C-alpha cells in the first residue's frame, strides 16, 4: 500500500509503527455551525480511508477532535446570548446527526478541546521550560526560530515565511512577538471570554496547541497518519509539527494526508466567502450514497467542482449500481437450483479478478475513482452472465462480492427490495398502529427512519406500499 505523504511530497510504502495497527488523527470541525459540503468531503474521504484500512485487516484507532473553544465560537455565543459550551453541545449533536446520515462511521475517540485544558497547560509549561515558548503579559507564543525544521511540512522556506508574516504584522499583539512568525499557544483572557486558571493568569488555549495535545495524549508521541483538509497544511499542521516535535524530540506523524477543496465556480467553498451549502441542505435532496459517490468520483488530492448537474450525474450512477443489485436479488426468487455446478465455480473464481483490481487501485493512494470503475465492471459482468438458469448460491455470492467492494466506500449497503422485507413490513404495521392511536410523532419517526435507510412509504387506497430510493 502506497500513500502520498505531504511531508515528503511523494508516494511512500505504508509501514505502520506497530504491525497490524494504525493510529490516525484527523482534524475535525470547529463546532459553531452546521458543516458545509466542503468540510463534508474531508470527513467522507478519511472515513473511506479508515474503512479501507480496516478492510485490509488493520486495527485502526481513529481520533477526530472537536474544536469547542475558539474565536468563532466566542463570537457565535455572544451573538446568540448564550455560552460557548452550549454552542459546542448544540453543534456537536448536529454534527453527529449529519455525519450519521452520510454513513460516516463514529470515531474511536472524539475528544473535545475543553476536556484537555489541564493537559494543554502542562504542554505549554513544558515548551516554556525547554525554551521553545515565551510569555508576554499573559499570552504565550511559540518561538519559531528555536525550531530549525519550521516550514518542512508545507515546503516553505524560512525567508518566504518571514516575509509573509512581516506583511501580516499590524497589531500591538504582533509587535510583542520576538519574530513575526511566532504564534500564540495560550491567549490571555479578554472581557466576555471563557478562561481557565494557569501559571500565566486566566486564559484559554490557542487553536494549534489543542490538536497537538489531544493527539499526543490519546495516540502517543508519534502517530501513523495525521490528516485534514488541504487548507490546514499551513499554518495549522505546520504549527502542530513544531510544537509537538519541540516537546518530544521525535517525529510527530509519519504520514501526512490532505484532501483537496470542493469549489463553486472554481472558487473554494467556505463560510467566510458565503458560497457554501451545508451537508444538511444537500441531504434533503440527495441520498448519502449519491453524496459519497460524488466525493469519490475524483481522487481525494484533486479539487472538485460542486454543481447540481454533477450530483444528478452521481445519482444516475448510483441508481445503475442499485439496479444491478436489484436485478440479482430478483433472481433469487426466480432460480430453481440451489448449489453451484463446476462451471459456475470457475466463473465465480474469475470474479476474483475484480477484487484484486479493486485492491490494486485502492492500495495506490486510495484511488476511489478507479475503484468505482471496477465496481461498474463487476456489476456489468454479473448482470450479463448470471440469469434464471444460474444457481441461488452463485447469485448470493455475486451479491456478496458487490457489497463487499462497496462497503469500504460506504456505498451499496442500504436495504433493497427483497432483503429484510419482514422487518420493513413490521415497521409499517407499527406505523399503522401508531396512526390509529393518533400517535403521529411515532408514525412520523418510523417513516423518517425508513427514509434515512433508503425506503420511502406511499399511502395508497390499497394500503401502504414501500419502495427503495437512491
Swiss-Prot record:
Motif annotated as 'KMSKS' region, chain positions: 268-272
Catalytic activity: tRNA(Cys) + L-cysteine + ATP = L-cysteinyl-tRNA(Cys) + AMP + diphosphate
GO CC terms: cytosol
Cofactor note: Binds 1 zinc ion per subunit.
Keyword Cell cycle: no
Family membership noted in the UniProt record: Belongs to the class-I aminoacyl-tRNA synthetase family.
Protein's UniProt name: Cysteine--tRNA ligase
Name of the gene this protein is made from: cysS
